[in-house]
């Protein structure tokens, strides 16, 4: 019974063979999912019906989850403030998460770093609270989606944001980078 659990940090960290169905878990009180599936090499199960509405940090959540490629479009991430390295080195992840309300997120550094397959639209994201986009799309070899609608006026850090993102060829002329 997970109905009273508030912290799931590192729950399946480095559990290389874990690939069980946990889709029915009650996660409605969880506030911390950081590193939950980090380096869970085999995990590729549905989580789309999870209630993540109270989660504040998803830092490293799927970092190195090299097999994971499941829809997450139903997630309510409106309370999340930290998505640093969330999909870093999640090599197969390529799902549409454009519907996410990321308006409270401050840190998106390394979020898709080395997510080699990721190439989904993110133009509907409200990134107006984000301050750190360091290496956000670094080594995303396939990513080439429009981001010109983003309000990046609070962003301070963009080092290597598109480093080795060899497919990226989008106009960013509407970006206000005066705080960088």
Question: Model-found features: residue ranges?
Answer:
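Negatively charged
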Residues: 1-180
């Amino acid at each position: 019974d997970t109905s009273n659990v508030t912290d799931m940090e590192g729950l399946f960290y480095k559990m290389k063979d874990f690939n069980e169905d946990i889709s029915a878990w009650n996660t409605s009180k969880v506030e911390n999912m950081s590193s939950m599936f980090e380096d869970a090499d085999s995990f590729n199960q549905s989580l789309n019906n999870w209630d993540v509405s109270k989660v504040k940090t998803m830092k490293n959540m799927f970092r190195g989850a090299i097999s994971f490629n499941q829809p997450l479009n139903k997630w309510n991430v409106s309370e999340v403030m930290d998505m640093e390295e969330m999909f870093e080195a999640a090599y197969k992840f390529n799902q549409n998460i454009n519907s996410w309300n990321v308006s409270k997120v401050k840190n998106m550094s390394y979020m898709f770093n080395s997510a080699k397959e990721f190439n989904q639209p993110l133009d509907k994201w409200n990134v107006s609270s984000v301050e750190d986009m360091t290496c956000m799309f670094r080594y995303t070899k396939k990513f080439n989606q429009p981001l010109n609608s983003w309000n990046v006026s609070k962003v301070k850090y963009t080092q290597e944001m598109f480093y080795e993102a060899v497919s990226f060829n989008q106009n960013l002329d509407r970006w206000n980078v005066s705080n960088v």
